[in-house]
Design a protein with these regions (language model features):
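Single conserved hydrophobic/aromatic residue that forms the stacking wall/gate
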Residues: 250-259
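Phosphate-binding/switch region of NTP-binding enzymes
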Residues: 35-37, 41, 45-46, 74, ...
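Walker A/P-loop NTP-binding motif
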Residues: 53-60
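Pre-Walker A (Motif I) flank of P-loop NTPase domains
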Residues: 31-34, 69
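Short alpha-helical segments that sit at the start of domains
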Residues: 239-251
């Protein structure tokens, strides 16, 4: 295809009024493609469910405001019965703009079209969560795993950018420890390279109910959030933020009731 290169000179770019990046969760989750990775049974799905719930309600995620809007959560390793139990654990009232699906097609086999149809019906959608990434990937005979990872995530990245939404992929970590948590994301660097933001949820100790959420991305400031899992409310509560101090008032709000 003989298509000319589209370009812009620096002066024009500097003087062009461009729309700001849209944040679904202020300072944490902008529009684009993102990965939330953690070890099995670490509590990724509990965190993802709560993020979906808060976003759909337009209520804060810890100290971070949300844009509010419709949310689609593809819970591809769960049943509706399990999702119902979890919802009853974390909230007294689920919003009508939070949608769940337990089955979908795979990438390049109809998933993109399924999401497109959902977005056309629910035009106020701001967030799509896919739990897990591996469930939507078909087997590949590609001799270059990096290229395969980058190509697959590129499809979702293009979809997110086209509709100015956030797509959050729930993923796993390697079993081997690393000083840099981002290096523990399973797969090649094609995964972390294709995404706009990467989150790693890592327990402080295997038996502990505390963990650190490492956050890094193109459009956010690097931060580490110290979290504690509340076994009664079934949500991850914020203890410390490496960037901004957490107020006593905020901590008390978490201790005395549900968000």
């Amino acid at each position: 295809m003989d298509r000319p290169l589209t370009y812009m000179d620096g002066e024009t770019l500097m003087n062009t009024v461009l729309p700001p990046i849209r944040f679904v969760i202020s300072q944490l989750l902008p529009q684009g493609l993102h990965v939330l990775a953690g070890a099995p049974k670490v509590g990724k799905s509990w965190l993802a469910l709560w993020l979906c719930l808060q976003t759909a309600k337009g209520e804060p995620v810890w100290t971070f405001p949300t844009a509010g809007g419709a949310v689609l959560y593809l819970c591809l390793e769960d049943s509706y019965a399990r999702i119902q139990r979890r919802l009853l654990d974390v909230t007294d009232e689920a919003p009508e703009n939070l949608f769940f699906a337990t089955m979908s097609e795979k990438l390049r086999s109809g998933l993109e079209q399924q999401i497109e149809r959902f977005l056309s019906t629910h035009q106020d959608t701001v967030l799509v969560v896919i739990d897990t990434l591996q469930r939507i990937r078909a087997g590949s005979n590609d001799a270059n795993p990096y290229a395969s990872d980058y190509r697959d995530l590129g499809i979702l990245k293009e979809l997110a950018d086209k509709h100015q939404i956030a797509i959050l992929l729930i993923h796993h970590l390697r079993k081997m420890n690393d000083d840099d948590p981002m290096n523990m994301i399973s797969g090649t660097t094609g995964i972390s390279g294709a995404t706009d933001t990467n989150f790693v949820l890592r327990k402080d100790k295997r038996s502990a109910n505390t963990a650190t959420l490492y956050c890094t991305g193109r459009d956010i400031e690097y931060r580490e959030l110290s979290l504690e899992f509340d076994g009664i409310d079934r949500i991850w509560k914020l203890r410390e933020d490496s960037v901004e101090p957490v107020s006593y008032t905020h901590l008390r709000a978490h201790e005395t009731g549900r968000n």
